[in-house]
């Protein structure tokens, strides 16, 4: 469960290392984001010479959450960290690589380019 002020690791090679959630998209009073949801965030930590700089406002899709999520078959999925991938306005990833596994929920939400770059889909 990601909400305002949540900090997430960045799981791509855009140059950002950590982002802070400013807003959860998808409704005026939407409070939480899960795997596959889009958030607006600001870059809190970045490496020098990266595509994004500290202070940039970006859109990102959540790919891993610590809070467990129930799937339609009754199983649960949870990860060791909260992580997101920075995306362009057309919902394609901004980086060219993705690090670590991503949730299967991304396929249901039609993030196919992101799925193809991911090393593992759980």
From Swiss-Prot:
GO biological process, one term: translation
Keyword RNA-binding found: yes
Cellular component GO terms, alphabetical: cytosolic large ribosomal subunit
PANTHER family: 50S/60S RIBOSOMAL PROTEIN L14/L23, LARGE RIBOSOMAL SUBUNIT PROTEIN UL14M
Name of encoding gene: rplN
InterPro entries: Ribosomal_uL14, Ribosomal_uL14_bac-type, Ribosomal_uL14_CS, Ribosomal_uL14_sf
SMART domains: Ribosomal_L14
Protein name listed in UniProt: Large ribosomal subunit protein uL14
SUPFAM superfamilies found in the cross-reference section: Ribosomal protein L14 (SSF50193)
Keyword annotations of the record: Ribonucleoprotein, Ribosomal protein, RNA-binding, rRNA-binding
PROSITE patterns associated with the record: RIBOSOMAL_L14
Function: Binds to 23S rRNA. Forms part of two intersubunit bridges in the 70S ribosome.
HAMAP family reported in the protein's UniProt record: Ribosomal_uL14
Subunit text: Part of the 50S ribosomal subunit. Forms a cluster with proteins L3 and L19. In the 70S ribosome, L14 and L19 interact and together make contacts with the 16S rRNA in bridges B5 and B8.
Keyword Secreted applies: no
Domain of life: Bacteria
Family, per entry: Belongs to the universal ribosomal protein uL14 family.
Transmembrane domains' residue ranges: none
Single GO term (MF): structural constituent of ribosome
């Amino acid at each position: 469960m990601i909400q305002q002020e949540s900090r997430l690791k960045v799981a791509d090679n855009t140059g950002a290392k950590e982002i802070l959630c400013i807003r959860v998209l998808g409704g005026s009073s939407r409070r939480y984001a899960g795997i596959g949801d889009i958030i607006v965030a600001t870059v809190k930590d970045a490496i020098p010479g990266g595509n994004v700089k500290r202070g940039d406002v970006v859109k990102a899709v959540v790919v891993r959450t610590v809070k467990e999520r129930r799937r339609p078959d009754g199983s649960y999925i949870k990860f060791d960290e909260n992580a997101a991938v920075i995306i362009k306005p057309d919902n394609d990833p901004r980086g060219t690589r993705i690090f670590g596994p991503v949730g299967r929920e991304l396929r249901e939400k039609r993030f196919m380019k992101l799925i193809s770059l991911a090393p593992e889909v759980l």
